[in-house]
Amino acid sequence: MKKKSLLGFLMILPLLLSSCTLIKKDAAVDAATEIIRLGDRTVTKGTIVSSVNQQMYQMAQLYAQFNYSYDVTDPEVIADAQNTVINAYKRDLALRAKAEELGLDQLTEEEEAQAKADAEESFQSNLDQIRESEYADSTLGEEELKAEITEHMEKEHGYTMEIALNNARDVIVEGKVKDSVIKDVTVSDEEVEAEYNTRVETAKSNYEDDASSWCSAFNNGTSTLYYTPAGVRYAKQILIKFKDEDQAAMTAASGKVTAAQAILDAEDSTEEQKTQAEADKAAAQAELDAAKAAAFANIDADADAVLADLAGGADWDTLMAEKSQDPGMASGRKTAETGYAVCENMTSFDSAFVNGLFALEKVGDVSEKIASDLYGYYIIQYTGDAVEGPVALDSVKEDLHSSLLTTRQNTVYDDTVSGWVEAADFKLDLSALKD
């Protein structure tokens, strides 16, 4: 059975886009009305209306994902969608004309094969998306369901395999046009160095007096940090976590302490209530202390075994991969290779972890088991020191050059296409969308 979807709202769009009049029109003739013409290429009213429907459908889906309202009956919303679609078709017509002028509009056999493969992938992706959103409860067989969704996409969205193929061809043609436009665009070494200096100064301004932010950026996977502040250490850890049942017992007892404290802090609590809350808090604290002691006792042997293995010469990384219960130290994680970046007084880490690390004297030192009320036991390795100062230019030069070149190429291409659109002799009849 097909689920109710946003299409129910969008079925009214053709009426909104072509308002009712007392004069009845032949639907086929009306749909064939030219809206845009450039040379011998045209875009009809039917095509515009279908594209606007699709544009608004996609926007409605996007807004719905974030629980935002998107009123498909709002004239301003409709007008905005129309403008977006019309500008896209003007750009497309100008590009097609230029591709033909440059002799780039014909595909080779290899390019045609690539277009077909891309079209099939795109069509299947759209089919799967609609299957998931609108046909999730369908009991139809696979082939029958595929046929129904294919028909649905054509009727409701104006999307067919032929359209997917034409779109894929257009992408390849535009790629050829773009290559011809940007082939002479370059970036000099001086420009790369200037960009490097700018990024270094920006990073220095951001991080020189805020090592915690640098550490957070590093630990979160920021690919390139152009300046490293002083005082950053790298640390790996073998975390021995509390047993689940012990963690649950501590959480329950802690909740009782918090509840009793809330009564003590409340201005409208009576003396009798406060007296009872004091007793409840004391009992809950005793319960919490006992639960915590039991929790540590239940993991003491595991932590001691790790320390014994290390004392016996076990390889740290091998043992960490086997024993640590910290996901950040799992094989394949960047932080497992380098260690966490940590600075003193860093609040995004447990203070027991930070203090334990900075109590170690030299790189390579390993702590004893360090008790954490939050997680269990930390066994910490002082892995290294981050080198203060800017990242080496040679290590980022290639990436910087690529980034600058891509940005410049896109700017040159966009400006060039905008010029083609501006210079094109379009014939427009936008009034036909209103009657």
Name every feature range the model reports, one short phrase each.
Residues 73-103, 111-122, 144, 148-149, ...:
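Solvent-exposed aromatic/hydrophobic patches embedded in short alpha-helical segments
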Residues 121-133, 203-207, 326-334:
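Secretory-pathway/luminal and periplasmic proteins that interact with or process carbohydrate-rich
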Residues 30-38, 80, 187, 230-237, ...:
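Extracytoplasmic
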Residues 25-165:
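N-terminal targeting/tethering segments
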Residues 1-83, 87, 217-229, 244, ...:
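Short, low-structural-confidence N-terminal segments
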Residues 137-171, 175-178, 192-193, 197-272, ...:
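Proteostasis/folding factors centered on peptidyl-prolyl cis-trans isomerases
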Residues 1, 13-15, 42-57, 106-108, ...:
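Solvent-exposed loop/turn and edge beta-strand elements of beta-rich ligand-binding domains
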Residues 33-39, 71-86, 97-106, 154, ...:
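Second-shell loop/turn segments in exported
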